[in-house]
Amino acid sequence: MSSSRPVFRSRWLPYLLVAPQLIITVIFFIWPAGEALWYSLQSVDPFGFSSQFVGLDNFVALFHDSYYIDSFWTTIKFSTFVTVSGLLVSLFFAALVEYIVRGSRFYQTLMLLPYAVAPAVAAVLWIFLFNPGRGLITHFLAEFGYDWNHAQNSGQAMFLVVFASVWKQISYNFLFFYAALQSIPRSLIEAAAIDGVGPIRRFFKIALPLIAPVSFFLLVVNLVYAFFDTFPVIDAATSGGPVQAITTLIYKIYREGFTGLDLASSAAQSVVLMFLVIVLTVVQFRYVESKVRYQ
């Protein structure tokens, strides 16, 4: 059986339909990326009026900067905490839906609410709750003799931004995990239950392998989220402190480019971060899409 391929009457119509997206891509992605690559090879004055080609000197200076290396490892640590915690917590809440008999719709709606909150608003919300002097959570912590002050304790500051970032991303992960779990044929679960397999073993032996593609997809998405979209949380909650302990790569780019006016160094850092994101994207399409197989 042959199928005819639809043909546009005007050969310009397909190009006209994709033109808006192409224009947006060029203006907001390709052009800024090209500008960053160009400035990363220049020595630029603080106002961007004059520049001099210096080749890879900015990158060499970058990797000899101890503060940049520290921010790199901070980003790795922060991204790992956010990604692993976010995926595990979201998967746990998605798996609980099966065991909630009453109020499941309310539970699902409640899980989706954080996604509607802006990242900066989420940070401010948890700042109020963790306020050293008047916060509700810090009040209960003080009852147990624990002194909380994230403005002076780098470990507490890291916990705060990780907690707020994970809370903000739970809804997104929950939605995908819930859809993936619901797509599993019930006959497999029921057959395993009849054979005497317990719920925990059913989850790890049946459900978890079947949702592996979604899990790997969310792994890449959450890593990119931790690299980029957590900037408002870090800025509103800690401003990268204390003592630059929460200064990630994206926040260091902002601080040096917009506050320190070091455009060349900021551009070089942007190129490095762009390279990392490209690597993550390649991993997604080359590994996630091709290596995950059902047996």
Swiss-Prot record:
Signal peptide feature range: none
The UniProt entry's GO CC annotations, sorted and at most eight, read:
plasma membrane
Q: Keywords, A to Z?
A: Cell inner membrane, Cell membrane, Membrane, Transmembrane, Transmembrane helix, Transport
Parts of the chain that traverse the membrane:
12-32, 81-101, 110-130, 157-177, 208-228, 263-283
Q: How does it sit in the membrane?
A: Multi-pass membrane protein
- One Pfam family name is BPD_transp_1
ABC transmembrane type-1 domain boundaries: 76-284
> Where is it predominantly found?
membrane
Q: So which stretches are on the Periplasmic side? A: 33-80, 131-156, 229-262
Q: Does the keyword Cytoplasm apply?
A: no
Tell me where it resides.
Answer: Cell inner membrane
Q: Which GO terms describe its biological process?
A: transmembrane transport
Q: Which Gene3D superfamilies match?
A: MetI-like (1.10.3720.10)
Q: Which domain of life is it from?
A: Bacteria
Give me the Cytoplasmic side stretches, as residue ranges: 1-11, 102-109, 178-207, 284-295
Family membership noted in the UniProt record: Belongs to the binding-protein-dependent transport system permease family. UgpAE subfamily.
PANTHER family named among the record's database cross-references: BLL4140 PROTEIN (PTHR43227), SN-GLYCEROL-3-PHOSPHATE TRANSPORT SYSTEM PERMEASE PROTEIN UGPA (PTHR43227:SF9)
Q: What does this protein do?
A: Part of the ABC transporter complex UgpBAEC involved in sn-glycerol-3-phosphate (G3P) import. Probably responsible for the translocation of the substrate across the membrane.
**Oligomer and partners:** The complex is composed of two ATP-binding proteins (UgpC), two transmembrane proteins (UgpA and UgpE) and a solute-binding protein (UgpB).
Protein name stated in the entry: sn-glycerol-3-phosphate transport system permease protein UgpA
Species name for this entry?
A: Shigella dysenteriae serotype 1 (strain Sd197)
Taxonomy of the source species: Bacteria, Pseudomonadati, Pseudomonadota, Gammaproteobacteria, Enterobacterales
Quick one: which gene encodes this? ugpA
